[in-house]
Amino acid sequence: MSYRLFSISVKLPVLSASLLLCSASLLNAQEKPPTNDASTAAPAPWEQIRQVPMSGGLRVFWNVAGGDNTTNYREAAAHGFEMVDLLNTYSDYPGRQKENIRKTLDTNKNNPWKKPEFFERIIRRNIEQRGNQNAIFVHDIEFSFEEDIDKAWSDPTVRAASKATSREQFGDAYLREWATWFTLPCQWAKERFPGTPVGIYGPQPFRRDYYGISGKSAQQIDGTHQSDAELWKHIDPFVDYYVASIYVFYDKPDSVYYMAANVEENIERTRRYGDKPLYAYEWLRYHSSNQKLADQEVAPWLAEAMAVIPYFCGARGVALWGSEPKRQGQYYQTLPVFTKSLGRVSDLSAKLAAAKLMPDEPAHVLWKARRPLVRRMRVSADEWIILAVNPWQNEDAVSHVEVSLEKSRISVELRGRHSEIFHCRGENVTRL
């Protein structure tokens, strides 16, 4: 693939209010907001939603905007969700997009030294107007650029702009300069709001992948994602946390392993830099690029899975994103399922936060072999918390999987496609 594409857009306008209202016109064409379905029963009210307070350093974020922000922001916060300052960093809403930075990249895919003259002014203004009201600050910066360095090197204008004297020197300078399109906004946000954690929705240490993981070897996966790592090494010093986008595309067993693998692969590639937390961005609707399922809410078994899997794969939190501009009240039929599942993590969050994630077979290996996903968190020699799910079996099926602990080996029962969590203390095993 010639161009780097960060395909999920979560575009929101720059407003001085503490929270943003996401409009349909601001979304990527592949992520159109859902239309109202009058035939669908109203979702459960917030009064029937389980609270999910976190402790010990684990977190859950609410990044859903819609037609009833006042109610949903208030209720989400009361239920344990933290809020997000999400900024469409390159936008120019006051100027009706006349100085939209992203638009300049439509005709500039290979010259990172060609920033528009309004680059800094627009970004600093947007940061100021976005404000600093919430738990974390997220720059939404997504664009494609030429990944073929030889092709970029062959352009005399770009080569001259780089001032590089060799192909090798150019390669490093080229990616380093593209990185500044992401890192400068982070620097400016930190200058304006010292102490606020700043990160990026866009490039990742491991670019979100599905078919590049499914059925592939570790060597094949590394090869496909080499350019991610080369770009990220220039970005890493400027972010306080990582984002892994795991929006679901398919109502298939594979989606469980896709979520797990994308979190794990990002975690694996970031530990060389330290232990900054990773947050998994999720959506309670299928990604709109799947036209068959576009705008439908994910199946309940997937809502149950996405609520807990990231925490057992190294993530320190999940961020629930969404855009519901035409809806009032609580937006989702599946939110009760999501929070009920997440509540199991909430109840044990202090223990899980301090537990050690034990080595297990990579998710991509289990995916290829169609075996259950099992993850083990060691609290102590006598206390473990286990996640196990077999999405390949029917909803009414039951199977068993053996799990090795430090002092014993246990067999746990897996019901249908449920994401099961077991709390093991001594000889006692409790299904949560």
What are the functions of these language-model segments?
Residues 26-28:
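Sec/Tat signal peptide C-region and signal peptidase I cleavage site
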Residues 13-24:
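Bacterial N-terminal signal peptides
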Residues 30-428, 432:
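Glycan-processing catalytic domains of CAZymes
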Residues 2-15:
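Bacterial N-terminal signal peptides that target proteins for export
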